[in-house]
Amino acid sequence: MKQSHPIQVLTKALLAAFVLAPFAVAVAHADESLHITFFQIAHADPDGGRLCCSNSSDYVLPGLGINGLPVLNPGGEGGAAAPLDLLGDNEITWWSPTHDSNVTYTGTGIVTLPYANDSFFAVNGTGSLGDGDETYYQAAILSGTLSAPTTENISFSVSSDDMVFVYLDGSIVCDDGGVHAATSVPCITASSVSAGNHTLQVFYVDLDPTGAALEFSVNTEGITTSATPEPSTLAFFGTGLLGLAGFVRRKIGKSA
């Protein structure tokens, strides 16, 4: 009976692992999903409870800052007070424990679209008015890959209490700034989006103790979204492949 060479065994095993890994990731991160990262903002934060009330579709500049955060458009606050949680380049730090001591990372998860939470209080969007805004304000970033089958304009709908900013490939698409009750804001890309994969980011924050809500959906048919694999997921597969390689080498050593 013909036996496979040990090197062939190792090659086939590793190849099979590489082929199957993307399918395993796809199961965990199915279409119409986004990754969500939660933050809570201390009630004592200088921006908490002081930015009411306004609606502004010009609250932030067109692109993200060097730290990957929304950048305030000075004078675009719609008549309300300007935020104080700013870096030198006017990046807003409500989503950055690194740059804001009042912000704390509290967890991650996967959400499906359309997403709707009319009680988006801390902790992690599961609280209520009585136990959420009384101590912390809620912030979150939804992120993932948006896949367009053809080159086209893409339409979204958002509704937020208080603010939400949607970016595609780092450029603003939906700007629902200001502290206000939940309002529905339809928005569409300023120009055609090329077919293929694009980076989607949704920045949400609640800063006033009277309500917290977020709704987000993609209106254009044929568009899919998927949660970007977390580094821990990729590390899992990397560790598994190394372990598999070690196992096969040990088998080769015993058979030699």
Regions found by a protein language model. Name each.
Residues 252-256:
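Short, charged juxtamembrane terminal tails flanking transmembrane helices
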